[in-house]
Amino acid sequence: RYDFRFNQLTSQVECRERNSFNFYFLPVDKRLMASITMNAQYEGLKLWDKDVVRFLNSDHVPVYQPIEEFLYDLPRWNGKDYIGNLAKRVPCDHPYWTQLFRRWFLSMVAHWRGMGKNHANSTSPILIGPQAYRKSTFCRLILPPCLQAYYTDSIDFSRKRDAELYLNRFLLINMDAVSYTHLTLPTTSRV
C-alpha cells in the first residue's frame, strides 16, 4: 500500500501511498505513522506502532540518495559550458569570475558526493549589489527544481546546533541579507 525510502540527505524516512494521485514522497511524521498503523489494522494486520517504527528504522526501507539520483539521471555531457553560462548571468567585471565560479561549483558538487572529505570548500561566491538586484534569485537558479528542497536562505548561525544541522541538511545555503560592511574588496571583485 505504501512506498517507503530513507532519504540519506535529510536522515528521514519518506513515504507515498501507492495507487494515489499524490506522486510525491512525504516525511513520515507521527500523524502519518499513526495513519499507516491504523490503515494496516483496518486491513487485518495485527501490529502496533512499535512494529511500524521498527520496520521504518530497519534496512528493509531502501536508501534514497537525491544527489546521486539526480547526477546519474543527467544526460551525457554534450560539451556545452552550462556552468560558465550560469556564471555569465551575473554582471561582473572581474576577469576571472567565470573560472572562479566554475571551480567553486565543481567543488560544491564534489562535496555533495562526499569527495574530498579531508578538505572543506574554502571559497564562497559573495554577491554584492543593491537590493532587488536578483542576487537571491540567482542563488536559487544554481539548484535544479528537483533539488530545491535542499536550498535555504534562512539560517541562524547564532544557534550552533541549528547551524550544524543546516550545514548537513542543505546542499546550498544562501546567507542573504548578511552585512558585509567589514569587508573591503577591490571594485573589480564585487559582483
Question: What residue spans do the PLM features occupy?
Answer:
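Walker B catalytic acidic pair
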Residues: D176-A177
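N-terminal nucleic-acid engagement/recognition segments and initiation subdomains in replication
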Residues: R1-K88, C92-Q99
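P-loop NTPase catalytic core of nucleic-acid-dependent motor ATPases
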Residues: F55-L172
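Conserved small/polar residues in nucleotide/adenosyl-binding loops
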Residues: T181-T187
